[in-house]
Swiss-Prot record:
A monovalent cation. Ammonium or potassium. The keyword Zinc-finger does not apply. The lineage of its organism: Bacteria, Bacillati, Bacillota, Clostridia, Thermoanaerobacterales. This is Type III pantothenate kinase. The gene is coaX. Substrate binds at residues 100, 107-110, 184. The active site is at 109 (proton acceptor). Its cofactor is NH4(+); K(+). Pathway: Cofactor biosynthesis; coenzyme A biosynthesis; CoA from (R)-pantothenate: step 1/5. One of its GO terms (cellular component) is cytoplasm. Pfam families: Pan_kinase. GO terms for molecular function: ATP binding; metal ion binding; pantothenate kinase activity. It is found in: Cytoplasm.
Length: 257
């Protein structure tokens, strides 16, 4: 079996693959203060739900955008799984040509999304990932990663609003019935949700134009469903895109050994 580990700033997502098929995913908070052993206990508990043990895992791939957590999970793989993980980064075979001024600046999450997106949906393609930051990544019809855009994510944007505007209450991020709010809560929900929908649609429309007008738009990440339902640009939500990219890159590197 194969274990894909997606380490983000807010959450860590685990995916178990059996013969190339995703059979289970789990999500846990990304905590830089946790030790190797503490994370091992959490993973062991997850595994116990499906009668899985550490020794069942034959390969591990890691995509991380949190440098302090990367060595913790590498050590966890050595200590508990007795497996050397593939950490996706510079020097790893991805099968993706990166046409970026400095390819090393492109985050592992964006690379794996691009790899999986092009493999599954073809190109030209735009991948929108709703994480701590909202990222937009463009892949042309040749399967080349040509760049993208990064904006503050919905979560950190709303946190900034709550922190700076002391009279505004904390709210649940749900779509209001109307864009014209009738109270403070619904007005905030309208501004945040429809504001982000507008941002996504505008950036994607401009990217499509630069890509030649026919690009597909695929979304992933925690709040993708919330935004996609009213977006004029997003065609599909694929919540397993990042895990699938980790698996694909791992397999490409195994094939080359």
């Amino acid at each position: 079996m194969f274990l894909a580990i997606d380490i983000g700033n807010t959450n860590i997502v685990l995916g178990i693959y059996d013969k190339g098929k995703l059979i289970k995913t789990w999500r846990m908070a990304a905590d830089r203060n946790k030790t190797v052993d503490e994370y091992a206990v959490l993973i062991h508990n997850f595994f116990s739900f499906i009668n899985l043990s550490f020794k069942d895992i034959e390969g591990i791939g890691i995509a991380s955008v949190v440098p302090p957590l990367t060595p913790i999970f590498e050590q966890l793989c050595y200590n508990y799984f007795k497996v050397k993980p593939l950490v996706i980064g510079p020097g790893v075979r991805t099968g993706l040509k990166i046409k970026f001024e400095n390819p090393r600046e492109v985050g592992a999450d964006r690379i794996v999304n691009a790899v999986a997106g092009y493999h599954i949906y073809g190109g030209p393609l735009i991948v929108v990932d709703f994480g701590t930051a909202t990222t937009f990544d463009a892949i042309n019809d040749k399967g080349e990663y040509i760049g993208g855009a990064i904006s503050p994510g919905i979560g950190i944007s709303t946190e900034a609003l709550f922190a700076r505007a002391s009279k505004l209450p904390r709210i649940e991020l749900v779509k209001p019935l109307s864009v014209i709010g009738k109270n403070t809560v619904s007005a905030m929900q309208a501004g945040i949700i429809y504001g982000f929908i507008g941002q996504v649609d505008e950036i994607c429309a401009r990217m499509k134009k630069e890509l030649g007008g026919a690009a597909k738009v695929i979304a992933t990440g925690g709040l993708a469903e919330l935004i996609a339902t009213d977006s004029r640009q997003i065609e599909k939500v694929d919540q397993n895109l990042t895990l699938e990219g980790i698996r694909l890159i791992y397999e490409r590197n195994q094939a080359g050994n």
